[in-house]
UniProtKB/Swiss-Prot annotation:
GO terms for molecular function: protein serine/threonine kinase inhibitor activity; RNA binding. Homodimer. Interacts with and inhibits human G1P2 conjugation by UBE1L. Belongs to the influenza B viruses NS1 family. This is Non-structural protein 1. GO terms for biological process: symbiont-mediated suppression of host ISG15-protein conjugation; symbiont-mediated suppression of host PKR/eIFalpha signaling; symbiont-mediated suppression of host type I interferon-mediated signaling pathway. Residues 1-103 are annotated as: G1P2-binding. It is found in: Host cytoplasm; Host nucleus. The keyword RNA-binding applies.
Length: 281
């Protein structure tokens, strides 16, 4: 294990995603009010229009992954975003907003805690690979695929076959693979399958990927955003195959988390989610 290798973390879940979208919608509302007052210069007007297009696209994508009862329009998110700004500006820990709950530093389990220091995002723990890292969420009857003695073609087909047999809902796929006889990685993937009336299934969302070495140490970690969705079943297989190919490139050093993240995110054209530092590591 190399001490100076860092994990790559990319966004962290539905609460943070909703909070970000709603907050940006609040910013858009402020831009529009300035525009109504003719207080925006030309660059400001350009930013307004670009932000609006970006939000409309992101909300449309995000709503696909939400139950119908939780889907919100841009107008609804603007109202929540403005309230969130008030929470931020006035630091009112009692004004909880859906998707944006105050966080008590002293007692994370207590939402309403008088005389506490409040922060909206807790301090980020150390980023070294030997930090304690929870495995992806437990799933009933997870599938384990052992690929130690298979060539690439057969292994890819086996992954595809296993994926096809999954029921709808969350799944956990454990892939074990020897890499140039140097190390065997245990790869845990959490995702969500959708089942359609015609019987077809598709991998709709990739939530998390962890890779561990033979000693159980974390080698690579990817936490995917809610809107990193897969459009169809073929894309789901392509992503899993891409992961397998990356792990099969084997070299004597542990795989860097940033490399793993790039391999996954590039399937979605989402490389921009990595910071320049992460991309270079």
């Amino acid at each position: 294990m190399v001490d100076n290798m860092t994990t790559t973390q990319i966004e962290v879940g539905p609460g943070a995603t909703n909070a970000t979208i709603n907050f940006e919608a609040g910013i858009l509302e402020c831009y529009e009010r300035l525009s109504w007052q003719r207080a925006l210069d030309y660059p400001g007007q350009d930013r307004l229009h670009r932000l609006k297009r970006k939000l409309e696209s992101r909300i449309k994508t995000h709503n696909k992954s939400e139950p119908e009862s939780k889907r919100m329009s841009l107008k609804e998110r603007k109202a929540i975003g403005v309230k969130m700004m008030k929470v931020l500006l006035f630091m009112d820990p009692s004004a909880g907003i859906e998707g944006f709950e105050p966080y008590c530093v002293k007692n994370p389990l207590t939402r309403k805690c008088p005389n506490c220091d409040w922060a909206y995002y807790p301090p980020t723990p150390g980023k070294y690979l030997d930090d304690i890292e929870e495995e992806p969420e437990d799933v009933d009857h997870p599938i384990e695929v052992v690929l130690r003695d298979m060539n690439n073609k057969d292994a890819r087909q086996k992954i595809k076959d296993e994926v096809n047999t999954q029921r709808e809902g969350k799944f956990c796929l454990t892939i074990k693979r020897d890499i140039c006889n140097v190390m065997s990685l245990r790869v845990l993937v959490n995702g969500t399958f959708l089942k359609y009336p015609n019987g077809d299934k598709s991998l709709s969302t990739l939530h998390r990927l962890n890779a561990y070495d033979q000693d159980g140490g974390l080698v690579a970690k990817l936490v995917a955003t809610d809107d990193l969705t897969v459009e169809d079943e073929k894309d789901g297989h392509r992503i899993l195959n891409s992961l397998f190919e990356r792990f099969d490139e084997g070299h004597p050093k542990p795989i860097r988390a940033a490399e793993t993240a790039v391999g996954v995110l590039s399937q979605f054209g989402q490389e921009y989610r990595l910071s320049p530092e992460e991309g270079d590591n």
